[in-house]
Amino acid sequence: MAIHDRDIPEENRRRLLQAGVGAAALGILPGAQFAATAQGTFDWKKFKGEKIEVFLTKSPRGDLLTKYHKEFEDLTGISVGSEMVPEQQQRQKAVIEFNSGNPSFDVIALSYHVQKRQFAKNNWLADLRPMINDKSLADPNLDFADFAKGGLFYAVEPDGRVNSLPFNLDPWVVYYNKELFAAKGLAFPKTFAEMLDAAAKLNDPSKGVSGFVARGLKNANVPVWSSFLLGYGGSFADDKGKLMTDSPEAIEAGKMYQTLLAKYGPQGVAGFNWNESQSLFLQGKAAMWLDGIGFAQPLEDPTKSRIVGKVGYGVMPAGPKQQVSALFADGEGVSAYTKKKGPAFFYIQWASNKANQTRMLQAAAGAPVRTSAYAAAQASSDFKAPKEWVECMLASAKIAQPGLPVIAPVTEFRDVFGVALTNMINGADPATEMKKATAEFQPVLDKSEKA
């Protein structure tokens, strides 16, 4: 799997700012190509007796890896110490530890949509190419041809560096309560207009039922708005880095967000993140919930959910211009500061191997980045995920585009526009808020790109 550099034109870097980068994510990879390595001696026991520290995000995927750490230890003889915390705390701690120059971890899970550009600009992750090209370090089954191109797009930098291995894809979908829809004689909406109509008809405050729920909490709420932005045909920025977040499309997306959450959402939704939204939905108190694909497991768990067997999995309805599923992704990287790069690289190869990817799908814990996992999981007698969920996942992946701009200050982007969106829930004018947020964030983006 030798990886070679290519010259990257400046326009490719600029395209990373645009929502339209989704086409590239599913097509040719910028900056790298993958070929087969020469065969050689690879031994999982090469680093027997070593110990590594792993820093994971609390999620069904993090739980899955932790559950099978003993398998990795038995396979390699490498001991694993791990810490797993909620994503916001994980992101904050990662910055603090990397800036210290002596992070406590050797391996880190990263959310590409938030940390990819930040980590790359600061050179916080080891370039994996030397190890990928070392026949004694690269598992012959690493097999980049098995990885979805959307995942590889996120893992490879425009200059050709490979800073991580992709682990999970997260296209956004609409979960819906089939029982509530059937009671009103409604079909799953195919368009934004039908989505608004369904939310209005299913909203019943007298019974404590909301027509729609999604993230209202600032920062966390931006992917909800961007899901609508993409359907309206909008972009985050043009090819020169000028924000387009005050465009007519962006404002219409803001209006859609405001109507669904303020008019048909639950009381207090401005403070909802995904976990509060999930809780409401699995109690049968929301007709629709827009979020990432990886929540089927708790929704179908009778110890947690009151709507087992009643959950519908719907592809994001089409906007006026196009039908798009906002795409996010996660990966695993090796700290540039660690002295245990070899053992750490062994860990991330194991984490993204075909067995773990298949387990992820079997547990309905996420959308594997390996294409072989889909056939393997469905052929297994252990496969318990709803067929409709898998079909929704695959259909969503076909229309996916990145749900956030690939920029270093993406957290600041989410903070600034997240406040604007929360203000809209509380009655503020969408056009005014989008223009204000755009004016506030443009200098931040300009400074970041010049740096």
Predicted regions and their residues:
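Conserved C-terminal helix/tail region of periplasmic/extracytoplasmic solute-binding proteins
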Residues: K45-F47, K51, S79, A182, ...
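Hinge/lid segment of periplasmic solute-binding proteins
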Residues: Q39-K46, Y112-P171, V308-G312, S381-K384, ...
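Extracytoplasmic/periplasmic substrate-binding proteins
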Residues: Q115-R117, P223-S227, E252-F346
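Extracytoplasmic "Venus flytrap"/periplasmic binding protein-like
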Residues: K70-F147, E179, A183-K190, A287-M288, ...
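Long, aromatic- and glycine/proline-rich binding clefts that accommodate carbohydrate-like moieties
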Residues: K48, V311-G314, Q362-V419
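N-terminal secretory signal peptides
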Residues: M1-N12, G22-I28
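Extracytoplasmic/periplasmic solute-binding protein
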Residues: L152-F167, W172, A193-L243, A286
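Glycine-centered hinge/linker elements that transmit conformational signals in sensory
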Residues: A198-P205, K240-A270
